[in-house]
Regions:
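Membrane-embedded hairpin module used as a gating/binding unit in multi-pass transport
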Residues: 42-52, 64-89
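Hydrophobic stripe of amphipathic alpha-helices that form coiled-coil interfaces
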Residues: 49, 53, 82-85, 89, ...
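Oxyanion-binding "anion nests"
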Residues: 73-118
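Soluble C-terminal extramembrane regulatory/interaction domains of multi-pass membrane proteins
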Residues: 101-214
Length: 214
């Protein structure tokens, strides 16, 4: 009986290795990267809008930001398919830490999507080109570009860690710096600036937490 049990276990292992579908990690990785870069592009668009001295198409900006929700949903579906494919696959154990890390990244991207939607809505509803030269608005735009840079750098670093690439792409742009200090509220556009500051604060905090592996 012992021999029969061992033979049965060996057969089950072979069947598991041969018959069980492979781990579906490539679609999830591809969806995550596409979503991350789309989020980064959205922050770059906000930065460009804040620096514009011409009329800004706020409705288009907001529509593009809202479209990111579909990216997040597709990535969520791909991650669900990945996790489902690991349940019966013994070779998937090595991916557990990577999956947990990517779940954190997806949560970060979800927060960033919500924040860039908020910033885009603020621009659509309240932005006036006359404030493009305001120092605080300029800092918010700079920080939005830094967030975009940070998102791209984070997802590319993951690819390097996973062995999906051997080099880090050269990305132009500075990393996040210190939070923005406001000496005193703007006498006219304090609502606009306050809303932008809060969204960019939450975005940078979420990105910094993910970058630190929290």
């Amino acid at each position: 009986r012992v021999v029969e049990t061992l033979i049965g276990a060996a057969c089950a292992l072979v069947i598991n290795l041969v018959v069980v579908p492979p781990v579906q990690h490539e679609p999830a990785e591809r969806a995550m990267r596409e979503t991350a870069y789309a989020v980064a592009d959205a922050y770059d668009r906000v930065a460009a809008a804040l620096a514009s001295h011409d009329a800004v198409d706020g409705e288009r900006l907001l529509a593009d930001a809202r479209a990111l929700r579909a990216h997040v949903q597709r990535t969520r579906a791909a991650m669900d398919a990945l996790e489902e494919s690991t349940r019966l696959n013994l070779r998937a154990r090595a991916l557990r830490e990577r999956i947990a890390r990517d779940e954190r990244l997806l949560l970060t991207l979800t927060v960033l999507v919500n924040r860039v939607i908020g910033m885009s809505r603020t621009v659509a509803d309240r932005f006036d080109a006359s404030v493009a030269d305001d120092p605080i608005v300029h800092r918010v735009g700079t920080e939005a570009r830094r967030i975009a840079h940070g998102v791209r750098m984070l997802v590319d670093r993951h690819a390097l860690e996973d062995g999906r690439t051997t080099t880090m792409p050269a990305l132009d742009g500075p990393a996040l710096t210190t939070p923005i200090a406001v000496p005193q509220p703007h006498p006219t556009h304090w609502v606009l600036i306050g809303a932008l500051l809060e969204d960019v604060r939450q975005a940078r905090e979420s990105l910094e937490a993910d970058g630190a592996g929290e």
